[in-house]
Amino acid sequence: MNKEKVLIIKPGYSETLDGEIGMITSLGDVLRSTVLLHLYKNAHVTWLVDEKAFPLLKGNPFIQKILPYDLTSVLQLQSERFDTVINLEKVAGLCAFSDSIHAWRRYGFRFDPENGVALAYDGSQHVLEICMDNEYKKKSGKYWEEVLFEMVGAKWRGEGCILGYKPKSGVNYDIGFNYDVGKKWPNKAWPMEYWKELERIIGNKYTVTWQSGLGNIEEYIEWINSCRVFITNDSLGLHIASTLNKKVIALFGPTIDSEIYLPDGVKLLPKTHYDCKPCIVSSCIQERSCMYNIEPEDVYDAIENISKKEI
């Protein structure tokens, strides 16, 4: 019996549950999308991805073919036939490309030929509403994975991401400082002076390692795996650490913490009365970012609590 042929289109140019579209590849969004592979473990899966995110998918046992998003791959896929196409990108050109693929079933986003914009296939309209209406998004109260499963007509039961690369490093440090947030959302960063103050408070009680391996995803994964407890902004490292079953302390400000499923972690939010938080935008309108209202002492207390059984 032939396996179901599934094409997943997720280069990472638009975050699935965010209205913003750009050409900065969202590596975290690509990794989080792998939760769908739990539904297609017995299928033949092809994944179209930006080359920057390729290392996140490489070696994944549930992806039979990984293709870089380029003209050659587009022409190849337009000549193939699939049972199911899942388009998780809202880029208009990718939606038009997705519609051109020969397939029996389609999920996610499609192209509106009248207006030249992305629309949703039946069953995904509420996802488009979440993307385009920040107030609706704040009130949704659903985990990102839950919404993704709903897009394909399935029920999420706590499944997590599936990382292809298997780290070889052991645990060498008590605590990892994951301070970088990348270029897309600079205001998600906890102030550097707070990281340094936290290190001072910790002193010699725990061994601390600062973020490394940023230029190579596999090295980055190895570094994360070397940490027992992981302190992080809302970034790629958060999702990798959760996938590796690390004890995570996640610092949230401008983004929605309730979207993030963190079974082995703690979420810390700013102690502030700003009406704008979470603003869900990449630049802050305040004189002082809300991230300044997560105190190093509070993070240290979280370390103590989460470390009682771990260190």
Question: Where are the model-predicted features located?
Answer:
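Catalytic machinery of carbohydrate-active enzymes
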Residues: 1-311
